[in-house]
Amino acid sequence: MSHLFPPSSPVAGKPLESPQKEPGKLANTSVLTLGRKRYNYELEEYPTPDPSSSIGRQSSPVKDITSRLNETKSALSSPSKQEKVLAGPIEIELDASDPSRLAIGRKKSVCNIILPCRKNISRQHAFISYAADRNEIKLECNGTNGLSVHLPYSMQLHLVKPFPTRNFYKLVAEEPLTSQNTKQSHGKTLQKNQNFISFVLAKGETVTFPYIQGSFINFTGVTVCLSLKKVAPYPGDGNNNFDEENSTETEDELCLLTTTSDDFSWQKETPSMKFVPVEHSPRTEQISKPLLIASPALVKNSPISYRTTPQTSFVINQPSTPKKLKRKSISLKNNTIQETPLPKDKIIGTLSASTRSGGINEEESFAAVAKKTKELSSTTAIVSPAQKRLKTSLNIIPEISRSLSERGIRFDDLVHVLCNHLAFSNLQQTPLSQLQNINSNTSQLSKDELKKVLETISCIGIIVREGKDASGKPLEDEYYYDVENDDSDERKILYNSLKGRSRLRSCRKKHKQYFWKRPTK
């Protein structure tokens, strides 16, 4: 029987006790039948298996109230519904004193008049300007969805296209001569009814029309009313009782008064300066400058007083005597020549023997000094090793190349092999004996010949070694590659690219210890 009576079903033969219904309405016996309706719902509205507090209610009253409140809140919070509720015409006040162009659209950063944010309104939908002298409004449409202009039907207006090639239209009061042709040419017609005249503007079209109070523009659902800004009248225009004498003048309106005008008194209030007589005033001494013509022997340097100001640290020199010219240290008093002392190892004989005679003039003494200094500079000229090497290489190259060509060895190929071997070798410097065993061509050369060839190459440096090694043999000269003096750009680029190749140090990096660690016992 358990499968016939589930837990929520009523017990057969038991009367239903429902608080909403009277107990006499239901049958005392309920017959359980399978395959057809258990109760007649036309007579009984809601047969419930078990009584509860919410029997007969379609929903809880508390839930119903909260749902209604939520609906009203959502309706107010929705921006689209708010616009519908609060929708009204937007007013544009045109300033007669300002003929500038105003932008109308939904983007705040680029527009002067902001429209609601709707998808059918462009960011910059239109541009409007007002010309007060002609009482005309110029309207340019920049929106994709266009706009419509509505004017009150107060006067007869006609839509004209003055220029056939431009999208420019004009509303005029005079009827054009060929009205039929104009309508066919521009394809626009005025829609007239009892109250308004309206026409549509597409994107890129411009129209000028006279300002009429009560005109408005429809931006695909948003209405914009046009009005003129009220300007406060000037006090002197409408008021005839304006007192000019008692009015307050501004600074710009004040007149400048000259000192010679009658408004200024001629009495001097400032006391005049008077000289105070001094009984025993010191007499001013007149300083006379001495003549600058004097003999050079008697000229003496006077002490120079330095004057410094606290603002600057510049030294002001005021020499009272002319400055003595620096010349060669030759004194003609005893007819002797004083020369600058030379180093001890390069002392040359004095010119006392040649200048003892008193008949030598100043020009001869200068010539003698110049001759001696020239001889001294020629004897003490030091030639750098690089210059010596360059001179010797220029003289030796033809001889070496001739001797090598007789053996069938090209000089350029030999230089190329030696430079490449020293540039790309793992050793920083290579002894001469190892360079002799590079290939068959270098092995044919003797040490002296190979040394001469190496001296002619500018990008190969030499390390001269003197002495003997442990076995008693003399130490050999070692040669290295100098990249800065190399003429081959290709070898330079290849050498610089292979600079970071792996060395002995890189294989030991993984064993390097970067911090102190206590040694293990």
Curated annotation (Swiss-Prot):
It is found in: Nucleus. This is Protein PLM2. The gene is PLM2. It comes from the Eukaryota. InterPro entries: FHA_dom, SMAD_FHA_dom_sf. Keywords: Nucleus, Phosphoprotein. One of its GO terms (cellular component) is nucleus. Residues 102-156 form the FHA domain. Residues 51-63 have a biased composition (Polar residues). Induction: Regulated in a cell cycle-dependent manner, peaking in G1 phase. Negatively regulated by transcription factor SBF (SWI4-SWI6 cell-cycle box binding factor). Pfam families: FHA. The keyword Phosphoprotein applies. Belongs to the PLM2/TOS4 family. One of its GO terms (biological process) is DNA damage response. Residues 1-63 are annotated as: Disordered. Binds to the promoters of genes with functions important for the G1/S (start) transition; primarily genes involved in DNA synthesis and repair, chromosome segregation, nuclear division and transcription. Phosphorylated by CDC28. It comes from Saccharomyces cerevisiae (strain ATCC 204508 / S288c). GO terms for molecular function: chromatin binding. The modification Phosphoserine is found at S281, S295, S302, S384.
